[in-house]
């Protein structure tokens, strides 16, 4: 199976980007073709053979990754598998691409693989980087209902069938939107602890727009994908969880601003998942109300 990789960059981490690209080049088996997308910024110097696309403006994470997908033909169809990797990450092992090939070849239902993210210094995997509710053991691989945006592999047939990431989300929850559409189309998602991306431990709230976009996109996610009966339940649960976390006053103000924005602005096409998909998510351990 032919493997490609998409990396988006703001051009501000040239050393980390080079280390990532070197780790991709060291993968066992056939070479992985790489496209680096400069998301509103020039692409730093990259090794020979790495293709680059420079965008005149920042299209956000999903928009930038979608450009990278199309660089491999419509829906990424020039390759069988696409890796999506953060530009400050590093593939910890040289057999990751081969493990992906083997996993997809052995399981026709498998559409997406979420890698384990580990801190390069401590080896720690943050709880939020284990894409399931029972996240206490990051070394346990399992079927899951979503995936990590900057450390994953996607079978391109999934993208050809259900489309790419939602451009308008810009940042936050775009992976879950794609995951739900893939699951509704019959695909499965695996979390694999043996496929590791080393990545420094960070807090998502480091992004200035975090609280607003998390809330807005949560509303869009529900409006786009959930049966009407579940929309208020899902959003009510997440509002309660947000309040229980006792965010700062500015963060809470930004969150409620984003929540209102999610209702007041277009969310894109609405394609509610089937009830059997709701049941599938429930059996996988995460009903779409949390």
Predicted regions and their residues:
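N-proximal low-complexity "stem/linker" segments adjacent to membrane-targeting elements
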Residues: 1-23
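Short, acidic, metal-binding catalytic loop of nucleotide-sugar glycosyltransferases
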Residues: 22-31
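Glycine-rich, basic loop-to-helix element that forms the pyrophosphate-binding segment
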Residues: 55-74
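Short beta-strand-to-loop acidic/aromatic patch adjacent to the donor-nucleotide binding site
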Residues: 77-90
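A recurrent flexible, glycine/aromatic-enriched loop bordering the glycosyltransferase active site
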Residues: 119, 136-154, 176, 206
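A short, conserved alpha-helix in the catalytic core of glycosyltransferases
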Residues: 146-154, 158-163, 168-196
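Non-catalytic, C-terminal membrane-associated alpha-helical segments of glycosyltransferases
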Residues: 213, 228-290
């Amino acid at each position: 199976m032919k493997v490609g990789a998409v990396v988006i960059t703001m051009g501000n981490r040239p050393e980390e980007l080079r280390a990532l690209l070197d780790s991709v080049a060291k993968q066992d088996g056939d070479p992985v073709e790489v496209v680096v997308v400069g998301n509103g910024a020039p692409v730093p110097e990259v090794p020979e053979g790495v293709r680059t696309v420079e965008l005149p403006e920042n299209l956000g994470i999903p928009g930038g990754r979608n450009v990278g997908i199309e660089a491999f033909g419509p829906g990424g169809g020039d390759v069988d598998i696409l890796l999506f990797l953060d530009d400050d990450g590093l593939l910890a092992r040289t057999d990751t691409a081969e493990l992906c090939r083997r996993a997809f070849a052995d399981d026709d239902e498998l559409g997406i693989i979420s890698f384990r993210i580990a801190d390069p210094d401590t080896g720690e995997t943050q709880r939020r980087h284990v894409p399931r509710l029972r996240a206490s053991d990051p070394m346990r691989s399992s079927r899951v209902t979503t995936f990590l945006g900057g450390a994953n592999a996607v079978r391109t047939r999934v993208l050809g069938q259900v489309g790419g990431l939602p451009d308008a989300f810009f940042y936050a929850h775009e992976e879950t939107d794609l995951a739900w559409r893939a699951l509704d189309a019959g695909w499965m998602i695996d979390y694999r602890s043996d496929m590791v991306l080393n990545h420094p431990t960070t807090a998502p709230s480091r992004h200035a727009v975090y609280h607003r976009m998390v809330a807005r996109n949560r509303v869009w996610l529900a409006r786009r994908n959930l049966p009407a009966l579940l929309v208020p339940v899902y959003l009510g649960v997440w509002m309660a969880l947000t309040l229980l976390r006792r965010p700062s006053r500015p963060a809470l103000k930004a969150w409620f601003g984003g929540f209102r924005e999610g209702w007041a602005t277009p969310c894109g096409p609405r394609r509610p998942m089937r009830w059997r998909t709701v049941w599938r998510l429930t059996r996988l351990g995460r009903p779409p109300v949390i």
